[in-house]
């Protein structure tokens, strides 16, 4: 009887996480790429946007769905001399174990570590985990981990001049999944 009750509770609790109200699963996960992918713009000397597909990802997620607690937005306006800079930051709230794993990657100063963010196994966007002390530039999505937060920038500020270009971070599939699992905080 005890085994049956334990098994029933185990089924209830393991199925409760990552599901929407109608029972469909909705998983957001982050994978490190198996190998380095080249920039889409091969003339670009800095790291920049790249393409990856499902076969470029390992079997196990680097950051699992249950480690993603929430997703928030932050907008800062910085005035410097005659210029105005707008920082539209998006942030994952994660477990400290997730940020510890990122910070233990020993990310090189020059080039970051490529990752892919997925929803239900489909790649939503790709980017780089970046070293906090790096002064190198990056023309692609860049992520920094600290405390229990991963800041996701469209590009590093020194390279984010194209106001009119598409922001891959603003993805309705990602936001719908986070909203359905009560993790989207605007």
Where would I find each of the regions flagged by the language model?
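Bacterial Sec-dependent N-terminal signal peptides
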Residues: 1-23
């Amino acid at each position: 009887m005890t085994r049956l009750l334990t098994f029933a509770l185990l089924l209830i609790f393991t199925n409760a996480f990552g599901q929407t109200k109608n029972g469909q699963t909705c998983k957001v996960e982050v994978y490190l790429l198996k190998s380095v992918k080249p920039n889409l713009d091969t003339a670009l000397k800095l790291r920049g946007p790249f393409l990856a597909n499902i076969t470029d990802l390992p079997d196990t997620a680097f950051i699992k769905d249950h480690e993603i607690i929430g997703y928030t937005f932050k907008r800062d306006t910085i005035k410097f001399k005659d210029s105005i800079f707008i920082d539209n930051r998006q942030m994952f709230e994660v477990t400290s174990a997730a940020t510890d794993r990122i910070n233990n990657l020993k990310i090189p100063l020059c080039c970051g570590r490529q990752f892919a963010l997925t929803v239900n196994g489909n790649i939503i966007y790709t980017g780089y985990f970046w070293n906090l002390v790096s002064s190198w530039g990056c023309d692609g999505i860049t992520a920094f981990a600290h405390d229990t937060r991963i800041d996701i920038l469209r590009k590093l500020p020194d390279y984010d001049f194209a106001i009119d270009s598409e922001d891959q971070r603003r993805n309705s599939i990602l936001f719908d999944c986070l909203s359905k699992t009560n993790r989207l905080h605007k």
